[in-house]
Swiss-Prot record:
Gene: atpH
PANTHER family for this protein: ATP SYNTHASE DELTA CHAIN
GO molecular function, one term: proton-transporting ATP synthase activity, rotational mechanism
Entry-linked Gene3D superfamilies: N-terminal domain of the delta subunit of the F1F0-ATP synthase (1.10.520.20)
Protein name: ATP synthase subunit delta
Length: 178
């Protein structure tokens, strides 16, 4: 995984630089998201790993799956990756590009783990509070973990805010053992 990310990083940075210069970050995000989804497909992955298929043919097959949803630059990028035998890194290129894009836009990614499904109003209130605390726009991805018993855990970068019942109980257990 680390090796794949190392290989994917220069591609993601090059696409990001191009997108930024063209003031077209959103279109490139869509292009990479589509290409990553195609590359992650089980059937496509089996083609990518097939040594009997030439890189040119593989690039053409990949583009045919994408259909007409890619512009000329997106198509050229796919063909470049195919020629270099790098189509399998598209999911990582997409992920790294998204990180560069959100950093450029001043957006922080927040991973919110809740004991129960959150309503839209609850999530909006939480995001508003987090934006006030961090003084940046927050993009939240929510998951549910019933083991928390109640409350939420918020992970932003290397900071963890644990407001869960499980976290409080664990802290009490540590305090009682001391």
């Amino acid at each position: 995984m680390a090796e794949t990310r190392t290989i994917a990083r220069p591609y993601a940075e090059a696409v990001f630089k191009l997108a930024k210069n063209q003031n077209d970050l959103a279109r490139w995000a869509d292009t990479l998201q589509l290409a990553a989804a195609v590359a992650a497909d089980e059937n496509v992955r089996s083609l990518i790993g097939n040594p009997k298929i030439s890189s040119r043919k593989l690039g053409e097959l990949f583009l045919s799956v994408c259909g007409n949803r890619l512009n000329e630059e997106g198509r050229n990028f796919i063909l470049l990756l195919a020629e270099n035998g790098r189509l399998e890194i598209l999911p990582e290129v997409n992920e790294l590009y998204e990180q560069l894009k959100t950093r450029h836009e001043g957006v922080l990614d927040a991973k919110v783990i809740s004991a129960f499904a959150m309503s839209d109003a609850q999530l909006k209130d939480l995001v508003t509070d987090l934006e006030a605390k961090f003084k940046r726009k927050i993009e939240a991805k929510v998951s549910v973990d019933a083991d928390l018993i109640g409350g939420v855990i918020v992970e932003i970068g290397d900071e963890v805010l644990d407001a869960s019942v499980r976290g409080k109980l664990e802290a009490m257990a540590v305090a009682l053992k001391s």
